[in-house]
Amino acid sequence: MASPALISETEAWKDLKAHLEGIKMTHLRELMGDTERCQSMMLEFDNIFLDYSRQQASPDTISKLYRLADAAHLKQKIDHMYNGDHINSTENRSVLHVALRAPRNLAICSDGKNVVPDVWNVLDKIKDFSDRVRNGSWIGATGKELKDVIAVGIGGSFLGPLFVHTALQTDPEASKNARGRELRFLANVDPIDVARNISGLSPETTLVVVVSKTFTTAETMLNARTLREWISSALGPSAVAKHMVAVSTNIPLVEKFGIDPNNAFAFWDWVGGRYSVCSAVGVLPLSLQYGFAVVEKFLQGAHSIDQHFSSAPFEKNIPVLLGLLSVWNVSFLGYPARAILPYSQALEKLAPHIQQVSMESNGKGVSIDGLPLPFESGEIDFGEPGTNGQHSFYQLIHQGRVIPCDFIGVVKSQQPVYLKGEVVNNHDELMSNFFAQPDALAYGKTPEQLKKENVSEHLIPHKTFTGNRPSISLLLPTLDAYRIGQLLAIYEHRVAVQGFVWGINSFDQWGVELGKSLATQVRKQLHGSRVKGEPVEGFNFSTKTLLTRYLEATSDVPADPSTLLPNI
């Protein structure tokens, strides 16, 4: 008998649907009262502790989710990914970001070729180059050391490296290595982003890293040309070769741009943009800032989770469990969003990065075979570090819509503070909230409890908390480069698990193309209107009205202006 075309047609899915009503009738207050259940929903790997006991799930739910994983052939799909099979079927590509952090002695193949030696050739080149820049043997055109780096990229070429950079900034080892250095990321084509990036920097001491696989990405290349002009207008055109390097596979265009092709760092088609932080995309700028040794620890941390994900049984597998629970929350309980709530300011850029990894990967409406999905898939991801988020959107999470939450805590702060006479230290104050919030969401507060506290009758409806709001708690021992790598890989693989179970292609992103193609038409119209005075034509009434209004209000912009750079 042929396998069902959609996971929702399997008996395992239907069994979970039937099981759902009983779970909906059971409050988390009752579920949390079962100590044996709670113990069964705790897991530890390499001193990372996961507690998922505050999920709206029983041990029977978890067993049924494992059966769903089997029905989706989850283990086989994971193996296919690690074996280099072309699981990105719409682009006919392998998906091998795990190879980017593999040790030298490991063999991971794509199309019959072990790609790990190629990866390490690039890593060795990055180490050599970043060492030379950091020790002053590679200098700028005027003989000054290059202490400042601007990485130019967008999407996956920006969000992942920015997350890691922000997390490392306050790590003691990394911050010591970065002393006297500056790393900035230029992503938005908005000239304000250019102005902010070059503000306070001198072209003489700045190295620009242009990140574009094809070297044709519109926003990135316009920003790259802008910084090229910033450098060449101050130092002369020949300075570009000393002040700009590339992460790209298109060597002819790199050379045409004015960058020495020897200073181009490769990556491959089997690396998706949102999974590219462990490639030269992230490793080069991060190594320039923190030194290769620190970044290598980050890669080792990611690899440790890669091994765990590929080898641990499902019941002891952190990414698998998190992925299955997300499927449960989205497709069965009907919760469309997830809040990522790290109780560490160093992780302030985690949620924006995972937002892209998750929503670009799993924001699909059809199966990998092109069939419309008859169930909800994908999550709306957002988040903010605690306790900032508590004074922002937690109100809605507690008393509005139900939004499953990921609470991420760190046992030892990167930068501990102790004040004599305080009841608790600063990190304990932070962690008090980390431990309290999941219980507040799970248990809530009943009208009966409020009456016992003599709360006024008219305020009881306003002060009632329904509870029964699911969350997971992930506790990391520290937040160094190794643990940051682990955290990244946990979320990357969790997203893959969701896609594998839903039966979608988590590794393409056709949804970003339509807007880009329409922008090409608008770009052509703006040029024609400014240079030739052409009327706005070929658009619907709304767009025509907006475009005309914009052109009229900017009629003072010259058709062929002289170069003007930000002045800030």
Swiss-Prot record:
One of its GO terms (biological process) is glucose 6-phosphate metabolic process. Keywords: Cytoplasm, Gluconeogenesis, Glycolysis, Isomerase. The keyword Membrane does not apply. It holds the Pfam family PGI. Its main location: cytoplasm. CDD domains: SIS_PGI_1 (cd05015), SIS_PGI_2 (cd05016). It is found in: Cytoplasm. It catalyses: alpha-D-glucose 6-phosphate = beta-D-fructose 6-phosphate. GO terms for molecular function: carbohydrate derivative binding; glucose-6-phosphate isomerase activity; monosaccharide binding. Its EC number is 5.3.1.9. PROSITE patterns: P_GLUCOSE_ISOMERASE_1, P_GLUCOSE_ISOMERASE_2, P_GLUCOSE_ISOMERASE_3. The active site is at E360 (proton donor), H391, K516. GO terms for cellular component: cytosol. Pathway: Carbohydrate degradation; glycolysis; D-glyceraldehyde 3-phosphate and glycerone phosphate from D-glucose: step 2/4. Homodimer. Belongs to the GPI family. This is Glucose-6-phosphate isomerase, cytosolic 1. It comes from Clarkia williamsonii. The lineage of its organism: Eukaryota, Viridiplantae, Streptophyta, Embryophyta, Tracheophyta.
